Each structure stands twice: as structure tokens, then as C-alpha cells.
Amino acid sequence: MSIDQLRDVKLITALITPFHEDGSINYDALPDLIEHLLAHHTEALLLAGTTAESPTLTHDEELELFAAVQKIVNGRVPLIAGVGTNDTRDSIEFAKEVAKFGGFAAGLAIVPYYNKPSQEGMYQHFKAIADASDLPIIIYNIPGRVVVEMTPDTMLRLAEHPNIIGVKECTSLANMAYLIEHKPEDFLVYTGEDGDAFHAMNLGANGVISVASHTNGDEMHAMLKAIENSDLKTAAAIQRRFIPKVNALFSVPSPAPVKAVLNHLGLEVGPLRLPLVACTSEEAKRIIKVVLEEDVEATRETVTGVVRPDY
């Protein structure tokens, strides 16, 4: 696997995990879900990320999920596997296992959470993972979830490693601009914030790793295409209509809103695993109206939530 599989990919969906009511993974729901995403312009899939509720998935469940998705996708789009933990040794072993498993363009490794490493600790952590495996690594920098933030300078140190191929950046547009300006040519920068996609792409980002593409993939594709064609007027118009939908999709802890919309669409992705809980019926109704534009007035109103969510 190599960076070439992802070089031209702009819209990556961070795949949710469908569950039965008893909390077991609903593998039968995966084919319809994945076909829905591919029909609406998803160009790659991230498995076992935050949106997949990965903290509640066992290691064996993640491997079973990888195998199931690979069988359905059958090479049609690149796949990225979530491999990172806050234990360097565990992350190394997982990256090795995924490399041996095969079929993945890269592994996504999150900045270590809870133990709050220094910048040097972060550097050593990712270097150790990248040194130990042939699996290309994408760093996931999301301080809202892990408390600590990798600085752009640390990121650029790691970008020199031949096996670290990119970052999913969820900090600030200022950091993203700095990274894009100073990164090596073959280092990919993705925004992990749906609400920032318009700005990030105009700064020169390679793409977006998205939650909203589950429900609004056509709009995202149209916006990205307009930016690619230098039609900023059209792209900006799409972004203005898109922002309330992003707000709705992050108005309560994710992925509860996106699951509510997908269930409404008949995709049967089911509930969430505790400690996350589903939207209330009233929350779900409001979110669905905004995200699917079933009520234009609701879309115009302020929806609780922010473009850069804490969830």
C-alpha cells in the first residue's frame, strides 16, 4: 500500500458502526450502508475511528469489521484502519497486525489520550509506530478529545518520516495553513471538521475526513468539485446552506445525530453503545428536519451546536 491510493481522494467517510438493539454489531446492515455512501460520492472509508464508537469495540470486533467491510467494498475505494491507542506498544502491535491483515491504504493513529504526553513524547510515539510497521500512518490530531495538541512544528518533524503520510487535523485553520505552507510535497493534510471543509480546501488541504458525508455526501461533493473548478461563488453558496446541517449533526454527542438521520432513511444502523446514548425523539425530529431540509424554516433557525464541535 502507498500514498498513491489516497493522493487524489478528497471525500473520506469516517464510517459509523451499525448495532442491533442488544448492542452486537449488525453486519447485515453494512452492505446497504456502504452502497449508500458510495452512491453519494464517498471516495474512501475510515474504519474503527471515533465515529465508529471505537472505544467500545473490542479488538476482535474491529478485525471482524475490517474483514466484513473489505468483502463488501471489494477494492472499489481505499480503506483506512483506526489503529492508534494511548499505549505505544499496543499501537505498534495493532499497526503490524493491520499490515499483515492487508487491504488497507493506511492506518489512522490518534494522538495519545489521557496520559497527556509532551511534544517529544508524541514525536517518539508516532516515530515508533511508523518504524515498526510497513503500514502507512496518518496522524489524528484532535485536542478536543485527547486534551493535548500536537503543534505544527512537531507534526512537520514527523512528516519527514517516510512512513508517516498525512494528518487528520482538527485544531485550527491557522495551524492547517501553516502545515500546508511548510509540509513536504508528499504529506497529505485532511481536515477532520466538516464545517471547516470549505476553508481548508481553499487553503490547499487534500480533503476532508467526514461524518456529514453519511447524510449530505452529494452537497459535500458538489462543494469540493466547485472549489476544484475555482467556482468559489457556487462553493460558498453550498457552504452557507451546509453549516446549519453540520451544527445539527453535532448538536448532541456524535454519532447520535447521524445515526438518527440514517435510521430515518431506512438504513437500520441502530442504537449507540453506552456511554453514548441516542437522540431523544424531539432531538431526532429537529435534526432530521435540518439535515435533510424537510423543513426550510427549521434550517433557517439556529440549531444548538457549533461548526467546530466539542463532540
UniProtKB/Swiss-Prot annotation:
Entry annotation: catalytic residues: Y140, K168
Question: What is any one GO biological process for this UniProt entry?
Answer: lysine biosynthetic process via diaminopimelate
Q: Name the residues that bind pyruvate.
A: T51, I209
The molecular function terms of the Gene Ontology recorded here are:
4-hydroxy-tetrahydrodipicolinate synthase activity
Show which residues form the site (Part of a proton relay during catalysis). T50, Y114
- One Pfam family of this protein, by short name? DHDPS
Where in or outside the cell is it found?
A: Cytoplasm
Gene Ontology CC: cytosol
Q: Does the keyword Cytoplasm apply?
A: yes
- Please report the name of this protein according to its UniProt entry: 4-hydroxy-tetrahydrodipicolinate synthase
